[in-house]
């Protein structure tokens, strides 16, 4: 076969003309330091703040400090096999997490990866973890109630959909129990719940997940967990990942309840990162922007306008106090950001008052306008009565003689405290709360011994379930009380045929 030189040169020319170079230009740098969840890299001159970076071994990092000679990076995940001298490249993207219906019922880490052993999550939708909060004109005022199922909260410090209500108290005072009960009570309320566990033991998170599964609440709940054994960057990111998942539902017209358990541990993780990145420390060694850390998170909870879907995110952030000190730095920061706080008292908890809500220190700044009419009527004076009872109780310790009016106030106060107690994981529908609080405020419990209040409550509910279902139905549908004559007659009838005469 003869080789034609002209043909060969024509073929080569054709190949050269048709050649399409396929190469990807990315800016790369070199890792100059790595340790304790952070790295420094030289050569990433155009990196953006918050940009996602990829290490040589496939791990991800996030640019935090942009300095003149290098970039401070937080490492998202395991950093043990990253070495000095490794290459690192920019992605040009900011961090996003998977979102959507596929996450419901799953337990995920802050990067959206499943940790429950139930396989991959089938969703192709993502949202950035950091997005601007809705503006003033994009919001609506809080007008719908969020029923927690706890008498002490729904009556004294009511929460509305779109509100941020801080739950603050020492360790072991029942903070998590309140949040879990609130999640359980959303069954059938068309709410999606997100429980963000920050810096907790994995065994504790497992217990909470099993509780949710046992009561059928995992069918509408997403659990985001960054356990105590994970690196600080994941603890810092967990709440932002949780609220990004919530925003997907909110902007599609749904209502979400998100629980941050707890933000004290997130602040500690952020302090650790900031000190490792050599940022100047401020009060209690926290960096100067620790207020912004929480404000930009909690401002993303809102009830948005109808143009944006009319959905809402209700936030229950937790703060753990030391020896009941609510004037600590992080505590006062979050109190000033939120729309009210529920203060759980160590003394009340140890005295058997559970939930241990201190009515004097707790307040809801917007939830009152979201209460249903029936609850407003029966719970109107409850807070003041309870506060004056606590005051009187302190005076009675001096042993002075009491007049009849004071004695009556004390008796009513003791019964109020008893009625507001509630066993764990037994949230009450609002119509039952209204009935027992009506019985309390209208004097039906004044002659019942304090030790029998719980039994009275159970038997009253059983009697109403059997004979007075119409009253429950009226409260449910009209959101208002039936006429006083009807309620008085029904409760009197129960008292007459019971052993509480």
Curated annotation (Swiss-Prot):
Its main location: membrane. GO terms for molecular function: ADP binding; ATP binding; proton-transporting ATP synthase activity, rotational mechanism. The record marks 362 as: Required for activity. It is a peripheral membrane protein. GO terms for cellular component: plasma membrane; proton-transporting ATP synthase complex. Signal peptide: none annotated. ATP binds at residues 169-176. It comes from the Bacteria. It is an enzyme of class 7 (translocase). The keyword Translocase applies. Its EC number is 7.1.2.2. It catalyses: ATP + H2O + 4 H(+)(in) = ADP + phosphate + 5 H(+)(out). It is found in: Cell membrane. SUPFAM superfamilies: C-terminal domain of alpha and beta subunits of F1 ATP synthase, N-terminal domain of alpha and beta subunits of F1 ATP synthase, P-loop containing nucleoside triphosphate hydrolases. It holds the Pfam family ATP-synt_ab_N. Keywords: ATP synthesis, ATP-binding, Cell membrane, CF(1), Hydrogen ion transport, Ion transport, Membrane, Nucleotide-binding, Translocase, Transport. InterPro entries: ATP_synth_asu-like_sf, ATP_synth_asu_C, ATP_synth_asu_C_sf, ATP_synth_F1_a_nt-bd_dom, ATP_synth_F1_asu, ATPase_F1/V1/A1_a/bsu_N, ATPase_F1/V1/A1_a/bsu_N_sf, ATPase_F1/V1/A1_a/bsu_nucl-bd. Belongs to the ATPase alpha/beta chains family. NCBIfam families: atpA (TIGR00962), PRK13343.1 (NF009884). F-type ATPases have 2 components, CF(1) - the catalytic core - and CF(0) - the membrane proton channel. CF(1) has five subunits: alpha(3), beta(3), gamma(1), delta(1), epsilon(1). CF(0) has three main subunits: a(1), b(2) and c(9-12). The alpha and beta chains form an alternating ring which encloses part of the gamma chain. CF(1) is attached to CF(0) by a central stalk formed by the gamma and epsilon chains, while a peripheral stalk is formed by the delta and b chains. Produces ATP from ADP in the presence of a proton gradient across the membrane. The alpha chain is a regulatory subunit. This is ATP synthase subunit alpha.
């Amino acid at each position: 076969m003869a080789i034609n030189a002209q043909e060969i040169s024509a073929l080569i020319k054709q190949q050269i003309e048709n050649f399409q170079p396929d190469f990807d230009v990315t800016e790369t740098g070199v890792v100059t330091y790595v340790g304790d969840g952070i790295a420094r890299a030289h050569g990433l001159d155009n990196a953006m703040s918050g940009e996602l970076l990829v290490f040589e071994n496939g791990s991800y990092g996030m640019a935090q400090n942009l300095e003149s000679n290098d970039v401070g990076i937080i490492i998202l995940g395991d950093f043990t096999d990253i070495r000095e001298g490794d290459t690192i490249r920019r992605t040009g993207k900011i961090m996003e997490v998977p979102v959507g219906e596929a996450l419901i019922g799953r337990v995920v880490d802050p990067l959206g990866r499943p940790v429950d052993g139930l396989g991959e999550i089938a969703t192709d939708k993502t949202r950035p973890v950091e997005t601007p909060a809705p503006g003033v004109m994009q919001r609506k005022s809080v007008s719908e109630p969020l029923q927690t199922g706890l008498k002490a909260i729904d009556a004294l410090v009511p929460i509305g959909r779109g509100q941020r209500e801080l739950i603050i108290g020492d360790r072991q005072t029942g903070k998590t129990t309140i949040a879990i009960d609130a999640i359980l009570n959303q069954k059938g309320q068309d709410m999606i719940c997100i429980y963000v566990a920050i810096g907790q033991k994995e065994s504790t998170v497992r217990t909470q997940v099993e509780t949710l599964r046992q009561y059928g609440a995992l069918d509408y709940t997403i659990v985001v967990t960054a356990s105590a054994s994970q690196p600080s960057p994941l603890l810092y990111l967990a709440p932002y990942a949780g609220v990004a998942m919530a925003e997907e539902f909110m902007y599609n017209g749904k209502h979400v309840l998100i629980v941050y358990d707890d933000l004290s541990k997130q602040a500690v993780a952020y302090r650790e990162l900031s000190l490792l990145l050599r940022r100047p420390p401020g009060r209690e060694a926290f960096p100067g922007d620790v207020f912004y850390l929480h404000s930009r998170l909690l401002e993303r909870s809102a009830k948005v306008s109808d143009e944006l879907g009319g959905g809402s995110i209700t936030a229950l952030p937790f703060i753990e106090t030391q020896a009941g000190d609510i004037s600590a730095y992080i505590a006062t920061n979050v109190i000033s950001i939120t729309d009210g706080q529920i203060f759980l008292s160590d003394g009340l908890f140890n005295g058997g008052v559970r939930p241990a809500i201190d009515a004097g220190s707790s307040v809801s700044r917007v939830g009152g306008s979201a209460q249903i009419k029936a609850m407003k009527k029966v719970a109107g004076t409850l807070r003041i009565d309870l506060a004056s009872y606590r005051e009187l109780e302190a005076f009675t310790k001096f042993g002075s003689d009491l007049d009849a009016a004071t004695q009556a106030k004390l008796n009513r106060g003791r019964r109020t405290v008893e009625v507001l107690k509630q066993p764990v994981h037994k949230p009450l529908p609002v119509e039952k709360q209204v009935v027992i609080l009506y019985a309390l405020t209208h004097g039906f419990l004044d002659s019942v011994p304090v030790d029998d209040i719980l039994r009275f409550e159970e038997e009253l509910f059983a009697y109403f379930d059997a004979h007075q279902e119409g009253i429950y139905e009226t409260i449910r549908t009209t959101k208002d009380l039936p006429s006083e004559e009807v309620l008085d007659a029904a409760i009197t009838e129960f008292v007459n045929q019971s052993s509480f005469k």
